[in-house]
Amino acid sequence: MKAKLIAATEIDPGALRDIGFEVDDFEESKDEDPYFGDFDADELAEFAGRNCYRSFHRPNPATAENEDYLNHIIDLGHESVFEHASATFYIEASRSVLTELERHRHLSFSVVSQRYVDPTDLGIHLPPALFKLHPDDRDDLVHIMESVSSEIDAVYEHIVNRLADRGLPRKQAREAARAVLPNMTNSPMVVTGNHRAWRYVIKARWHEAADAEIRELAGELLRQLRQIAPNTYQDIPDVPYSY
């Protein structure tokens, strides 16, 4: 599984100051990507909330700091302010994870085409459960699943070539042959969501009852989102939710 933050909303501090909202002078982390270290999403959420009451001057000392203000917003459940900023990830995960993730309709997807791209070149993602086993069991099952994948690749290529030999365009041949591909097939995708959407995804998938691979993905998304919007995700635990 791979997840990489590739884009995030940036604010125009000068424009906000002209309106009357003074932007906090955050110090960027020395350990993180400098392009995504200024917490613009947190600032934008606060600005949006304060605009509702024209409270840019921060009259309440208890919510004068961004962290405290957003904590109050979260407590009240007024999460629409988190919709103004977005984050985009490049993700490589199994087709199974794609199916789960696409159920979150508030996310936007661009996914590799199995009609135009040969999926056998993209690799596979083995279930996380295998890597919790004793090494002997793990190695045996990894070998079995990789062998099955190789066999399916051969069957896939045979079907594609057979159909192409009968005159079908390659994309139509791949369209038919993809029926034999397993759920562990790698499915590179670009996924964008606003921070309210990402909060919903993580709160649903960062849970011990969730599918193991998507839970692992949710944890990685949370880690990276906290680098750009720590106060937006301040209420989400470092370990998966439990019953």
UniProtKB/Swiss-Prot annotation:
Cofactor detail note: Binds 4 FAD per tetramer. Each FAD binding site is formed by three monomers.
Protein's UniProt keywords contain Calcium: no
Catalysis: reaction(s): dUMP + (6R)-5,10-methylene-5,6,7,8-tetrahydrofolate + NADPH + H(+) = dTMP + (6S)-5,6,7,8-tetrahydrofolate + NADP(+)
Positions with a binding annotation for dUMP: 100-103, 113-115, 178, 205
Transmembrane portions of the chain: none
BP GO terms, sorted: dTMP biosynthetic process; dTTP biosynthetic process; methylation
Classification via InterPro entries: Thymidylate_synthase_ThyX, Thymidylate_synthase_ThyX_sf
EC class: transferase
Residues at the active site: 205 (involved in ionization of n3 of dump, leading to its activation)
Amino-acid positions noted as binding FAD in the UniProt annotation, renumbered to this chain: 80, 103-105, 194-196
Swiss-Prot/TrEMBL keywords: FAD, Flavoprotein, Methyltransferase, NADP, Nucleotide biosynthesis, Transferase
Molecular function, one GO term: flavin adenine dinucleotide binding
Top-level taxonomic group: Viruses
Pathway(s) annotated for this protein in UniProt: Pyrimidine metabolism; dTTP biosynthesis
Domain (ThyX) ranges: 21-239
EC number, as in UniProt: 2.1.1.148
PROSITE patterns given in the database record: THYX
Motif ThyX motif in this chain: 103-113
Cofactor: FAD
Xref: Pfam families: Thy1
Its job: Catalyzes the reductive methylation of 2'-deoxyuridine-5'-monophosphate (dUMP) to 2'-deoxythymidine-5'-monophosphate (dTMP) while utilizing 5,10-methylenetetrahydrofolate (mTHF) as the methyl donor, and NADPH and FADH(2) as the reductant.
Family: Belongs to the thymidylate synthase ThyX family.
Quaternary structure (record): Homotetramer.
Protein's name in the database: Probable flavin-dependent thymidylate synthase
Organism field: Mycobacterium phage L5
Gene of this entry: 48
